[in-house]
Amino acid sequence: MSHTVADMSRWTGRAEPFETARARYWYQLAQHYAFDSTSQQNGQRIGLVGFACDQGVRRNQGRVGAKAAPPLIRQAFAALPVIAELQQRFDGQLPTLLGDAGDIHCHDNDDFAANMLEQAQLNYADKVSQIIKQGGLPIGLGGGHAIAYGSFLGLWQALQQTDTNSDTDALPRIGIINFDAHLDIRQSDVATSGTPFRQIAEHLDEQGQPFNYCCIGVSRFSNTAALFDRAEQLGVDIISDEDCTNKKWKKIAAQIADFIESVDIIYLTIDMDCLPSSVVPGVSAPAAYGIELSFVERAVKLILCSGKVKVADIAEINPTFDIDSRSCKVAARLLATIIEQHLLNL
């Protein structure tokens, strides 16, 4: 396991020498994330952290390759323009908004490796925790969906260290919103990309805390009856892929809003296999049905507008199976949506 600092050579895009200064792209704004007091002094509001690990996918019998995604998602995002609203809102502050915190790597030699995933999750969690404590929003770039347990641990650590009371009853109610075709609450003798939310449930139960989990885009063809039984036992809020397609937006939005209202802070995670394989072919477990990108964007904006999101991540992009960088570009668009909505909500 290792951490590499941000490779700023990935942050490139087109030049606009004949346009006004408002022809800005994200590659022109990104800086190294400073894991010290200067991040607060400089006003860094966003910290990107890569989780270059797909050991969990391998353990979950999936198709590997997601560990190569973080730099490619960054590259696709870097070339996107900065919207006018952000330029107006943060005039004079733009170069300090976004920091790249580099990548956590899992050196498993493309084979099953004991403890490598677990150590990578802990090291990734440490970066997430530091960014939260410094007042920023950490956004993880996977990698497999085992990133989810690391994101949660980072949030949990930050809450433990910032809470003045040792009494866990005083902790804010954590809500998890996951866009995913899979529930990811499998039983297994080791951690995998299919177990993170069961692990989170067990962690919270040990701490006497409730498990508030809403999974959006769940496919009945991607989860066994045993998993749906476990979801019922754990009290999981499920919005199926068919609901996302067939129900009116107002009804779905009300369900999401009710969940948001029931918690104090939110961990938002997007498994890119929630989208149809025709839209994102490059994922670890492609979906035959999926939910529309327009729906995901609309729901993400609703969630971000609550002001409760404290950590977010995007997982399961697999460049090995991508076509014309299509999947990385969709991930970059969702990353931009999260960043834009978070900053505009400050």
From Swiss-Prot:
Q: Which UniProt keywords apply?
A: Histidine metabolism, Hydrolase, Manganese, Metal-binding
The reaction(s) this protein catalyses: N-formimidoyl-L-glutamate + H2O = formamide + L-glutamate
Check the record and name the SUPFAM superfamilies matching this protein: Arginase/deacetylase
Positions with a binding annotation for Mn(2+) 1: H145, D180, D184, D271
Q: Which GO terms describe its molecular function?
A: agmatinase activity; formimidoylglutamase activity; manganese ion binding
* Cofactors that this protein relies on: Mn(2+)
Look up the EC number in the record and give it: 3.5.3.8
Q: What class of enzyme is it?
A: hydrolase
The record lists Mn(2+) 2 as bound by: D180, H182, D271, D273
**GO biological processes:** L-histidine catabolic process to glutamate and formamide; L-histidine catabolic process to glutamate and formate; putrescine biosynthetic process from arginine, via agmatine
The UniProt record lists the keyword Ribonucleoprotein? no
Q: Pathway involvement?
A: Amino-acid degradation; L-histidine degradation into L-glutamate; L-glutamate from N-formimidoyl-L-glutamate (hydrolase route): step 1/1
Q: How is the cofactor bound?
A: Binds 2 manganese ions per subunit.
Q: Does the keyword Hydrolase apply?
A: yes
Instruction: Extract the PROSITE patterns matched here.
Output: ARGINASE_2
Family statement: Belongs to the arginase family.
* Physiological role: Catalyzes the conversion of N-formimidoyl-L-glutamate to L-glutamate and formamide.
- In Swiss-Prot or TrEMBL terms, this protein is called Formimidoylglutamase
Organism of derivation = Psychrobacter cryohalolentis (strain ATCC BAA-1226 / DSM 17306 / VKM B-2378 / K5)
Taxonomic path? Bacteria, Pseudomonadati, Pseudomonadota, Gammaproteobacteria, Moraxellales
